[in-house]
Amino acid sequence: MDNQHNLNKSNESFQEFDKQRVQELEHIYVTGTSINDYSGSTNKAALKMILSQRETPQAITVITNQMMQDWQTINIDKILEHATGFYARRSASLDRPRFSVRGGNVNLIQIDGVQQFPGGRRPNVNGDSAAYERVEIVRGANGLLTGAGDPTATVNLVRKRATNTDFQANFGLSAGRWDNYRGDIDLSGALVDDGTIRARFVAAHYDKKSYIERYGQQKSSIYTTVEADLTDYTLLRLGVEYADTASEGAINSHSQPYFFSDGSRYNGKRGDTGMTAKWSGWPLEEYTYFIGLDHAFDNDWQLNVIATYNTIEMQGGELFFVYPQSPINPDGTSDLGFDYSAVISSSKDQQSTFDISLQGPITLFNRTHEVIISYNKFNRERTSYGKDADQTTISLQNLNFHEWTGDVPRYPFKDLAKQNVSITKSNGGFAAVRINPHDLVKVIMGARISSWDYHSDSYDTITGEFKKMQYQETVTDEITPYAGLVVDINERYSLYASYTEAFRPQAYFDENDKMLAPSTGASYEIGVKGELLKDTLNFTTAIYKNVENGLAEPDPNFSEKYLTPNGNRPYVQRGEGDTTKGFEIEFTGSINPNWNLSAGYSQHKTQSKEGDQLDTDEPNKLLNIYTTYDFNHYLAGFTAGVGVNWQNSFYATPQRPLSNRQSEAHRIEQSSITLINLMARYEINNKTSISLNINNLLDKHYYNSISSWNGYVLHGEPVSWQLGIRYSL
């Protein structure tokens, strides 16, 4: 009877309860005080409203700071490998993985809820994860916040906040296999006695080699932020992020051949790689400046404003690699010899963003509802420097794949000149309302209107003069709807359903040289969410369908030789494209105060409109289980954990060379595999702890990626370890 009364309380009681809930969630969200567990109880990633996972009508994963510390995930790409349904394909480079989820690529990255353009801030370019409190992931389309995108997932990185407590300091050092060294420092505290002005400083540096021969990377990052309470209801935030990344050696050719020229197998070491010069280097330097203002009004409405300016600069990236003109022979030679590619590149990205939102309660029909109105703007300019002609030719004699060491003279690159300037502009606004028609029912409805423009200009690298506009795309007043429903079954479980969209501009033109409308990606999702074990363990199960509509196809009324007056081949839009259907289940949080758990299983199938299965060269069934237990009752200060990663088989069908210089289709398959990871931590005292992490404990041999084109493969990482020590004040 008491439970029934709680579920059907009056609207006046609901208003007071909801107000208290919002205040509590705001405190947890802002301060990051989600205790030492894996729950990630609140998020703003889906709607910018502070909602619990159960209140959000989409599948959400939150990687908490505790989980990042337990498993020593120092890079964003490593963090995402712990997320349900995410697969990291490292076909070309360990630095630049391509993440896929729900049958498509993940391209949308946000920082503190503000969108970063692909290329403006990617998981592989990002600085050390030390600057972030947690990572929030929304699976499915998220066009309400972003407009342009894919119906896959959005990743939101949440920065650490300054604390208003006494001075705190945290220092860490670690060393691992392949000369992997790292150090970090995290300082925070009040700058004045009453805590109204406070600051945080985070810095990290690592230097590592790899199981891949002739490859290494160094990365330094700094993050500092200052917060000031201008009034009891107004908060000002300022901050700077800096990241300096230098990769060297085998930067972009980590895969190795699967076949020799006669069709026999190449059985090399897992670290064998392409023929890249040791001196190849790819330096990136990044600065991000941000300022934010938050204000709470007397009527419980909130104003949030944030502006950022970001630059990524590469000065003199040099890449030199050799490749065979024909398949490699068993003795390491090539019948047609070897050629080389020499690339020197510099670029500068400048990106500015502005985001403002206003949200709060309204009363309608004697019930309280929540409304949010938001506007955001993104501008990005990328300048590339290169050289079109007058490249020096060098001679490489008597090359052999088996004997390649990377010790070649430095290539005499020419001076660079401006080659290309591309400008992207995007702006849009959205409005959404969380309607409360019944104490057990919440309906979310919203829509976004977006404009998007991209154009690229080329320049003569000899004279430096403007040559022509190479490319232009424009989208105006694109509408993106959002609809969600959450129904509470009881105090523990809720049913939810959602329909979300995103759009993608298309650089295709019809017979009249008019650019086609954007394609749209739609996500249909239903599921059940729960808060188990006294609300300490989150549970989600979801069934979804992603559909791409309005994809461009060649106009069947014109021959392939026909071109429009501007030299374009005519295209038309043909309705439905690829379809992905899938299922996910996830548990995150704590089973009891000593036992943390993050477990997720996903499976999907992607088909073309003709019914052909796509993406067979990646696993479509993934299981991640990460759990830790604090043995304090048995051995004071000792925590241990195990991680399990399972994936099903996948395959590619490249062309296998034959001895007569012919070829035939040949299937290369990676069977299903289970990887075991371990962690252990011992607190020597209340200030000092030591830790050990072991990945791929059983040293399983497997392929991370298989090329459908030439059959080249990249081996997964062998067993590795990392030993760390941490000291706190």
What are these regions (language model features)?
Residues 206-210, 223-229, 233-296, 311-349, ...:
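Acidic/polar loop-and-plug regions of large Gram-negative outer-membrane beta-barrel proteins
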Residues 4-7, 17-166, 526:
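Acidic, small-polar-rich N-terminal luminal/periplasmic segments of exported/outer-membrane proteins
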Residues 294-298, 302-308, 312-318, 495-496, ...:
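Membrane-embedded beta-barrel scaffold of Gram-negative outer-membrane proteins
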